[in-house]
């Protein structure tokens, strides 16, 4: 009678010891697909809107027009980032060692980028509107500073790959076409 119970306890202990530590519930391939599709959509959307902004400003000769177009750009970029954060949250955490930590750190990095974008949006709204040339120069400077915010997302992804060294997760990211498009491979 005690042998089946003892064998059951040993099996539970062994299974627990072999289970990934701090793992999530999402298969690595599903996680990579969701995250990279979200990141690709975000990156492409921001790039398209930035190019459209540049084209739309050609010939703009009043502060109201310039302000409106930049306002649309910043609002769209913050909204896209909110959508990306939601996508990553919805993806859950990968079922790998420290998958919850990976997901948590990725979400924190995206929230930091969102904060930087929202800060740029506030700086933009505070620009003086009395001089078109000065206003446009200030707006361009703020927009150009966004490059650092956006680049930080890519840097964070690289750092996460080095910090969380799950072979299964790295393989899933490497095999996922959306991730390959992000990395240019």
Identify what each model region corresponds to.
Residues 1-8:
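Bacterial N-terminal signal peptides that target proteins for export
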Residues 12, 30, 172-173:
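Processing junctions and N-termini across compartments
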Residues 14-17:
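C-terminal motif of bacterial Sec signal peptides marking the signal peptidase cleavage site
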Residues 21-76, 178-184:
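Immediate post-signal-peptide N-terminus of mature secreted/exported proteins
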Residues 33-47, 68-82, 104-118, 137-151:
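Generic structural signal for well-ordered, non-transmembrane alpha-helical segments
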Residues 46, 50-53, 81-92, 117, ...:
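Extended amphipathic alpha-helical scaffold segments
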Residues 82-107, 119-132, 160:
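Short, solvent-exposed, charged loop/turn and helix-capping segments
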Residues 116-182:
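A charged, solvent-exposed segment within the mature domains of Sec-exported extracytoplasmic proteins
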